[in-house]
């Protein structure tokens, strides 16, 4: 037939088929409704959400653009801008919902949230960390390192499932090794939190603490406790807690999966709120650190523990 393969054209076609990064064809919206918009990504976890989502969007042929929703750009006005730019996909990071979300017409958009489904009334796909599973894993690893009286200090909030995972981890343990968790009320003063921790330490006598509250190391230091000499310490989110050992919640993966879910909705032409919300939980991974060394139980203490 006289046909000769064009090597350059064949190479370009192969590159297009196999490249992980596709040409950018459209935009996706990241809605930031924080009163101080810059504060959102000052949290390392949430900045990683953005990084993971941005990379995944580029690989799928999209660009992730941030839109700050406030008095100057209310949700109703933003909707017109998104329509004009043909933006049909919205990714909502953690934080407050945009004012006016109840009356906004979501029917033209595919929507995914990067937050606990218990923190929102929007029926969407929600991608978040497996808080209960992470707490159970952390408590188990702490026991494997020789700690027997592992306590939990956290914020009293039903939407946060760390405490639930901790309580499940206590089931089947020796009753003398079960500790009552300390749940601090959000909004109370640091001094009230400090006094609560002081009483709890006296009542429960933990040899290690699992926490999701970044102020715990400083509070323990003020009370005269040394980490790790006096007790071990592990965090349920090491990126935003000044604690070296604990759970890495894999936030970049949370952002990546959020985009993956959003692109799937767009491809299937699924628009608007869902009839039934769906939860995608991402498991964390354990990170060793100096705040939780392996504990050596002295023979005398070991004997007294089994008496």
Residue spans for each PLM region:
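Amphipathic helical "hinge" segments at domain boundaries
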Residues: 1-80, 85-88
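Flexible loop/turn connectors
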Residues: 194, 198-307
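Flexible loop/hinge segments that line or gate small-molecule binding clefts
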Residues: 93-136, 235-246
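Short beta-strand elements in bilobed, periplasmic/extracellular small-molecule ligand-binding domains
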Residues: 54-69, 151-153, 163-193
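Hydrophobic alpha-helical segments within soluble ligand-binding/sensing domains
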Residues: 123-152, 190-198, 249-270
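Periplasmic-binding protein-like
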Residues: 29-30, 84-94, 149-155, 181-186, ...
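An alpha-beta-alpha
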Residues: 137-174, 272-292
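Hydrophobic structural packing positions in well-ordered secondary structure
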Residues: 28, 53, 90, 111, ...
